[in-house]
Amino acid sequence: VHETQFKLALAVLLLMVFYARLYYQRGRKGFEKVVIKHEKREKFLIELFALGLVPILFYLLTSWLDPFSFSLSTEIRWLGGVLIFMGNLLFIWSHRALGKNWSPLLEIRKGHTLVTKGPYRFIRHPMYTSIFLIGTGISILSANWIVSLSYMLPATIMYLIRISDEEEMMIERFGDEYTEYIRKTGRLVPKLSILRAQSNNRP
């Protein structure tokens, strides 16, 4: 399989991801913000993440990053494409569950509700899970160190910096309800104990 085929597959999959983001971004206008935290920092993190996408464009459009490739079998690389697709499905599912509650920044809106349906039934931050799934898929499908690091490093920095503040903000807004929600769910992956309990409770 020629490298061009992997690049074309990655381009198509990323266009699907960006289309999903633009679609839901369009629906967030017109809601009144009540609380917004660390606005400048949050905007910087988003810009850092966007900047990390630039090397991916160089990979797709040029051969400049070819010296940074690493060896993977064809089958494994196509598995990367599957991970990107699955990550995008989780991304869309998360957006649909959140509805008007979604924001790219740390903010509480008027009428903000605690969402515990869809993927939020099992994990508190499925969008981060989808971002890491997509990033893992990009790393495998491209088989390129620069592409992998340019996506995963900003994504990891964003997650580590903001996750505690995000949960603290939710506790301030929802109190014991969110504390109980934390007990029942994992941050990025479901708690096995909860999955077993739900499985045992099925008729």
Ranges and model annotations:
Residues 1-116, 134-203:
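Membrane-anchoring alpha-helices and their flanking helix-loop junctions
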Residues 117, 121-129:
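Histidine-centered phosphotransfer motif of kinases
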